[in-house]
């Protein structure tokens, strides 16, 4: 039976306690299209974490650029207008699908410097040293963002490289108005910025505190972008900018060298591909755990009638939580950099394997995580990542998730170059087999080694239906990335939501350990909560989960953008 959407999530206030969610039954995409108030676009759509970045991407598309051209321009624009996660000094992953169905994955994840070693964050007693992998020059991995964009443009871009850098340069030179959220974030970190940047940084206001509407001008960052515009890859990994990075290392106790920078290479990798209810799901392969985790979750729940049970019904939540519990246990033990560790990818996304894992589920009571798997779990990834989705008029699609790890990364701005360094080294297991700074165990597959890429949860994803593009989706959110993308896909395919409704809908998270379910802002209704708690599930509320930016292609070919209201995200199209 088909029904209309019973609750408009766009109007809900995140942070409100006691949200009551009505159940949904399945609705066909054509019904969703007819009933939806979400705008649709005939040609291209860009959805990013910042209005200025979305404008940049849309302008590229309108001027004849393709999805990859727009993605490159957006990436550099985000480095200016979204400094807490958009970056030059970080890395990420891209999943690409051409209008003809060709797919590719690009790994521009950061790497450990050549002088890195597995015990580099431990004291003389072998215990992790607080903040050493989180702040300062030693926490930085070798950045991959610039090389990633160079490689993406060289293979799939059509517009002039220099032209794609101009909007970001202008935003850095002329400044852009801070949102209230951004002003508050910068003010909260003032003391840390002063500590790690004794020579000052554009992120520190000369007098008083930042306020919404203040212009953030970043002249040093503009100069770095000009180097990249004029010299491409060499403008960052060699010459003046590279020298400034190494000089910054020497101001602290950093170990990144000119050789590390010169030798960095982003890698083209085959995306991981699977199916869910007749749809083809294309996502990022390791060293991202996202694609494998997402496909394993989808396979784990595929046999259950979720659409009949309804959105966030008691049975739906039980199945999803038990799937998440099992998949995150496997993620902890079996995933790492495939250049250093043999990842059993085929097994982890196999239908029979995941169905068998679900056989131990008991609908009458919660599973105990220690009884599901007693393996080791890697440290969590920060939630300060960013994602953007782009589809051009021809149907080429790009899904990119990028990060510098924690909000504002290492808090170190490269003196003279104006960009923040990542603190991605914290995504390694500082001490395999012992609790890390978060009280979680670290896996051997993710131990620190020179030149190795740290494990990630980033999950840039593209979905097809009957050989045609259907959805482009991804999110920041650290360990919640995989479950957020999982839920948004189910919201569309099982619960008949349109793209904006699927993004707006409240989310929950479970990651094997710790034991509890984490609904955002009391998202699970009170009756369902009581039923789950009576069965032994522990539920602890938390704040917002993820900031999903996604695009849905409707049966008539028009496109919907879904921009997450949890942030300043904006969807634009034409």
Label each residue range with its predicted role.
Residues 31-55, 59, 67-232, 236-238, ...:
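Noncatalytic scaffold domains of N-terminal-nucleophile
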Residues 2-17:
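Bacterial N-terminal signal peptides that target proteins for export
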Residues 80-105, 255-257, 397-465, 495, ...:
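Active-site rim segments in enzyme catalytic domains, especially the processed small/beta chain
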Residues 303-403, 416-417, 424, 432-433:
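Internal maturation/activation junctions in enzymes
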Residues 25-28:
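C-terminal motif of bacterial Sec signal peptides marking the signal peptidase cleavage site
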């Amino acid at each position: 039976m088909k029904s209309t959407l019973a609750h408009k999530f766009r109007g809900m206030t995140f942070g409100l306690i006691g949200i009551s969610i009505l159940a949904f039954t399945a609705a066909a995409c054509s019904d969703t299209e007819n009933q939806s108030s979400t705008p649709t676009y005939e040609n291209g759509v860009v959805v990013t974490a910042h209005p200025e970045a979305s404008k940049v991407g849309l302008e590229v598309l309108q001027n004849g650029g393709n999805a990859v051209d727009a993605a490159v321009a957006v990436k550099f624009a985000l480095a200016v207008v979204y400094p807490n996660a958009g970056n030059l000094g970080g890395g990420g992953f891209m999943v690409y699908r051409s209008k003809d169905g060709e797919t590719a994955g690009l790994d521009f994840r950061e790497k450990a410097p050549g002088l890195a070693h597995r015990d580099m964050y431990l004291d003389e007693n072998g215990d992790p040293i607080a903040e050493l992998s989180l702040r300062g020059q030693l926490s930085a991995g070798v950045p991959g963002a610039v090389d990633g964009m160079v490689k993406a443009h060289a293979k799939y871009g059509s517009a002039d490289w220099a032209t794609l850098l101009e909007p970001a340069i202008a935003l850095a030179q002329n400044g852009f108005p801070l949102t209230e959220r951004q002003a508050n974030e910068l003010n909260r970190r003032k003391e840390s910025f002063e500590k790690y940047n004794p020579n000052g940084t554009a992120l520190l206001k000369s007098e008083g505190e930042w306020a919404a509407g203040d212009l953030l001008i970043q002249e040093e960052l503009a100069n770095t972008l000009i180097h990249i515009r004029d010299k491409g890859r060499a403008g960052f990994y060699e010459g003046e900018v590279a020298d400034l990075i190494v000089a910054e290392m020497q101001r602290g106790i950093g170990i990144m060298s000119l050789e590390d920078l010169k030798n960095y290479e982003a890698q083209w990798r085959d995306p991981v591909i699977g199916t869910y209810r007749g749809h083809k799901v294309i996502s990022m392969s390791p060293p991202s755990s996202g694609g494998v985790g997402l496909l394993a979750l989808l396979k784990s729940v595929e046999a259950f009638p979720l659409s009949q049970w309804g959105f966030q019904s008691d049975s739906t939540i039980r199945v999803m939580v038990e799937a998440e519990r099992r998949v995150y246990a496997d993620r902890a033990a079996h995933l790492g950099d495939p250049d250093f560790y043999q990842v059993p990818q085929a097994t982890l996304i196999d239908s029979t394997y995941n169905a068998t894992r679900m056989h131990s589920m008991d609908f009458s009571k919660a599973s105990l995580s220690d009884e599901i798997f007693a393996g080791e779990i890697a440290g969590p990834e920060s939630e300060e990542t960013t994602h953007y989705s782009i589809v051009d008029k021809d149907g080429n699609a790009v899904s990119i998730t990028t990060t510098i790890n924690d909000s504002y990364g290492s808090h170190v701005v490269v003196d003279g170059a104006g960009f923040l360094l990542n603190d991605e080294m914290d995504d390694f297991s500082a001490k395999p087999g012992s609790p890390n700074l978060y009280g979680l165990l670290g896996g051997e597959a993710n131990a620190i080694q020179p030149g190795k890429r740290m494990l990630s949860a980033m999950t840039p994803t593209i979905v097809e239906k009957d050989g045609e593009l259907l959805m482009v989706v991804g999110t920041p959110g650290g360990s919640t990335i995989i479950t957020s993308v999982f839920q948004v896909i189910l919201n569309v395919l099982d619960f008949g939501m349109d793209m904006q409704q699927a993004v707006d809908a409240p989310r929950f998270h479970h990651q094997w350990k710790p034991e509890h379910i984490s609904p955002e802002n009391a998202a699970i209704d009170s009756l369902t909560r009581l039923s789950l708690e009576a069965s032994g599930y522990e539920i602890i509320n938390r704040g917002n989960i993820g900031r999903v930016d996604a695009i849905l292609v409707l049966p008539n070919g028009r496109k919907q953008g879904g921009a997450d209201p949890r942030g300043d995200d904006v969807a634009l199209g034409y």
